[in-house]
Amino acid sequence: MHALTIAGRELRALFISPVAYVVLTLWSVIAGTFFLASLIGFQERMMQLQQFQMLQQIQETNLNDQLIEPFIGSMWVILLFLLPAVTMGLVSSEKANGTEELLLTSPISIWDIVLGKFLAGSGFVFVMTAIIAFFPMLLFVYGEPELGKTVSGLVCLLLVSMTYVAVGVFASSVTRSQLIAFVLTLVLLVMLGLMLPFLVDITLAGSGVGRDSGISQAVQWIATGSHVDRMLRGLVDTADLAYFAISSAVFLLLSKAVIESARWR
């Protein structure tokens, strides 16, 4: 109950701040631009296929593979750079405003505080996901995309967003500066989402260890990219769902440990 109260308060605070509207505006404009560009590219490919009478290729053309999957995949990458602005003040603002001590000395548990912050951020990314869902839904009016793949892609975007919110809560808990929290979250997300497998592959290649090694496979599991790719293709696996749940739990537990340590200082 305390967690929901904190979540409601934080979510209202987010939507009062101009940062939320800047993020949502940028998110909507970028999404609209990417979707329109993808749609134009798809129409041009279809016209070329019709021009050369490549009927088999036209029949095999899939809206999900050619349009929806690349669109949601692109927005996942954009998320890495916008989400830190949403999460940077979730905990650090309490420290900067001097209200952290009030929270720590209240009967509210540390876990309620962490969970409340996380739920507030999750509520915000739900709105972001709903904005993205609007664009693929338009295709159902004029075409026949696969509903299962479309829903899987949107659920994937929501799950990875919630995982990144947990990362942001952790980064925000280690500092009183929102700027530092922003930078730290950005670095962690870029590493987790994009750079980690690449850096490990380079390191292992230099040491003569193959990509099939245990280390490489472990890093591939830790990085979000492989899990996102599978779900965008409509392949929903319990291992991928477990990954998002475990990753979120780990960063929330780390956040709890950091905040709890402040109580005993």
Name the predicted role of every residue range.
Residues 19-22, 158-190, 196-206:
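A structural motif at transmembrane helix-loop-helix junctions in multipass membrane proteins
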Residues 18-46, 77-82, 188-193:
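Hydrophobic alpha-helical transmembrane segments of multi-pass membrane transport/permease proteins
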Residues 1-24:
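Aromatic- and glycine-rich beta-strand/loop motifs that create alpha-glucan
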Residues 67-93, 128:
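Long, hydrophobic alpha-helical segments
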Residues 38-65, 184-258, 263-265:
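Terminal transmembrane helical anchor/hairpin motif
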Residues 84-104, 118:
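Transmembrane helix boundary and interhelical loop/hinge segments in multi-pass membrane proteins
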Residues 32-36, 59-73, 115-180:
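Secretory targeting signals
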